């Protein structure tokens, strides 16, 4: 789920018409999750005619949702459990629950747009493909919801056999539970990425000799791992065009993660090098890579995650208004580790949302992170 703030009058009919066109081209967005007796997998069923059914588009009443001029925690409190936050997973199976909601929240001469799509039917790439189609200047495209079985078949070979199963291990589950129960209060920070600091860091990284080129994402990933003192770092990657038969027109969940340990993110070039071999995406601090922790060592490992949405996102072009700020919404009570979201805060600026129990303001000194995205939404940054 994301929220985007605008100034100017909300173009309600333009958004409604645009959403109707997007759903007509992608009727699976109006679908329902079902599972029959004895079935092992959940299915998405939908009307190919793609009607804009109830619950897909919401216009809030004035004052119904207070999201302007309040903190990130207050925004999350308003969103949590509301009709604007769609429910995926088992809670939505064999119900009439929508898997997508687009909502306009008016507030005088300004307004906010929330877009929520269930992670059951969409990963970050799919989300932003749909989100970007709401723009008046964007092309409305049809994406295929048909599951490509080549993903499961090729996953272990691409990211490692043990790595492809880590999410399902008892140790990983207990690590997340322990963090949520005993980790302490989660604090939200959000900073812009400083372009000048990034360029200086890229120049320095070239001297390391790991790679002739490092991206901004490489820098941010290595920086986040060090800031959080991670022993296990997860970086989701989009596997479209990296696994056979899966391309840009495929909707659904086609991402997995590269997992790193302490020796694998000492330098930004190591992140770049881990993605450099087509068809094989693996940490490279040692050759061969050190096996991932397991059992009690995995339970106790300091676990962090960083995911990059900025490469998928574009600003929204809507008639009669101007976009001011965009950022992800994540339930602070559901944070399983030290999390960072890289996203497109404005048309030209990249932001990083940090959800952390451990991070201190002093830790950010000397990093590539600059000013806070917004001092009201993220006070004390």
Task: Annotate the PLM regions.
Residues 20-124, 132:
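Acyl-thioester-dependent condensation/acyltransferase catalytic cores
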Residues 108-110, 139, 209-210:
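Short, solvent-exposed loop/turn segments that connect beta-strands within catalytic domains
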Residues 116-117, 130, 219, 223-224:
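Short, hydrophobic/aromatic alpha-helical segments in well-folded domains
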Residues 130-138, 234-240:
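Amphipathic alpha-helical scaffolding segments
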Residues 1-40, 181, 186-381:
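Acyl-CoA-dependent O-acyltransferases
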Residues 39, 136, 146-148, 237:
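Short, intrinsically disordered/low-complexity patches at protein termini
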Residues 97-99, 122, 131, 139-187:
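Intrinsically disordered, low-complexity regions enriched in acidic/Ser/Thr/Pro/Gln residues
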